């Protein structure tokens, strides 16, 4: 089967985990990994797996006679904002795993196929990938005037990039709750849990709903979205059934549905407790595969 050629820009933990997922893909063939640290473990692992590697950054990749069909970038927002127009000029499609948000945001269960023609798509945040689908599941059944998510992740799984971008995380995720999740107003909170041994990612999703909402339909919609996510993140699961509460002072006089989920990683490179990172690489792979299928069908 013909596969779309892929370059991974970035050689850190996320890029390395992504590499293992891409290698299993029926549609994507990782051939290059680009970094800036010649001693990085990611580049060393990529070389052992037969990829062409360079520590000379994006300039090296764009100067190669053969260009990739897709690039997955897991560097920083600043680096990707600089590189994105260069990828587009070279005819390379980009899947952005940084907070740069140059292109439209994609959450597979909600809007996977809406932006397959875009030159650049953004994967929002780990918290967004884990929680926005649940908001979407509720909002496609009833109006959601307000939604709030709390993402709790192991502190050791949050690298310097995550810590430096907490404000961007909350703003980007909150915006995604509204624009993709379908809530009229959204709020996001992230908690870095220092527990040892590290805890698996856990998320709480609150949605305000009409008092007379069809609770069975909402529950069914949530279960269907969870099943969709489990196709590419097997460790994604509900901790219990969605909980419905009647209007109260605590909820601002609105009825609510609360959903609790946890995300256990596949353990490809990152440890299983780092489900917050695993769901990003898994979702990016899913999006890349859909883009590749469209590219290859056009070429055929």
Curated annotation (Swiss-Prot):
The active site is at 126 (acyl-thioester intermediate). NAD(+) binds at residues 11-14, 157-165, 276. It comes from the Bacteria. Keywords: Aromatic hydrocarbons catabolism, NAD, Oxidoreductase. The keyword Lipoprotein does not apply. Pfam families: AcetDehyd-dimer. It is an enzyme of class 1 (oxidoreductase). It catalyses: acetaldehyde + NAD(+) + CoA = acetyl-CoA + NADH + H(+). Its EC number is 1.2.1.10. InterPro entries: Acetaldehyde_dehydrogenase, Acetylaldehyde_DH_C, NAD(P)-bd_dom_sf, Semialdehyde_DH_NAD-bd. This is Acetaldehyde dehydrogenase 3.
